[in-house]
């Protein structure tokens, strides 16, 4: 991709919750104290409507192996990222970007900049699926401490924009629309008195700011975000057909009607059939 020469300034599971933090591997280069200002960048990718799609400065490292080991599951609550459609195109976000899990599912376009020795041309597109935790015991090489904006990429994604030996590189990033295949999926967890739903494969903005549920015998019930992208209600909806109303961070709302039949069970996944 060609780079031009001007500048663009562009969030418990109460019964069984455990903090899911994947151990992170960081590069070994000396700390980069300042990320240089960015050149003007060609208008590539698919910006989201209603979201800020300006380019911003950050850094990137990698964790896991070439096959995506250590990147599965994580603090967003997703499981097998391959089965859920995210694959290797994922990243763990620093505190400044993770937003207590509300950013889970968001999509970003990232490019390596200002480091010709290590940067490779082109961009990558990733989904936020994990959290890169801060480490306050150190003062150097701690890229995920606030207020730093940082992407801990899967190794295959890092290698698309930088050489392995770089370890950590300055990047430019922006929000883009998530392109998904098929409908939004709804995975059931919990028990009759603590229904937990994990929505995934969410298109459009990708990240959810509000989720509601409705049974055959109820009105719309606002769910609570528990951890990551797991949403809960204490209302017993067993034996009822279930519908969902989902609002993404850009304000778009969609109704997913009659997603779950009245004989649904826990541990099942249902297809919402439509997407954003």
UniProtKB/Swiss-Prot annotation:
Ranges of residues in domain Expansin-like CBD: 193-272
GO cellular-component term (any): extracellular region
Protein location: Secreted, Cell wall; Membrane
Pfam families: DPBB_1 (PF03330), Expansin_C (PF01357)
Membrane association type: Peripheral membrane protein
InterPro entries membership: Expan_Lol_pI (IPR007118), Expansin (IPR002963), Expansin/allergen_DPBB_dom (IPR007112), Expansin_CBD (IPR007117), Expansin_CBD_sf (IPR036749), RlpA-like_DPBB (IPR009009), RlpA-like_sf (IPR036908)
PROSITE patterns: EXPANSIN_CBD (PS50843), EXPANSIN_EG45 (PS50842)
One of the GO biological process terms: plant-type cell wall loosening
Domain Expansin-like EG45 intervals: 73-183
Signal peptide interval: 1-27
Primary localisation category: secreted
Keyword field: Cell wall, Cell wall biogenesis/degradation, Membrane, Secreted, Signal
Function field: Causes loosening and extension of plant cell walls by disrupting non-covalent bonding between cellulose microfibrils and matrix glucans. No enzymatic activity has been found.
Entry's family note: Belongs to the expansin family. Expansin A subfamily.
Protein name as it appears in the record: Expansin-A25
Organism per entry: Arabidopsis thaliana
Source taxonomy: Eukaryota, Viridiplantae, Streptophyta, Embryophyta, Tracheophyta
Gene name, Swiss-Prot/TrEMBL: EXPA25
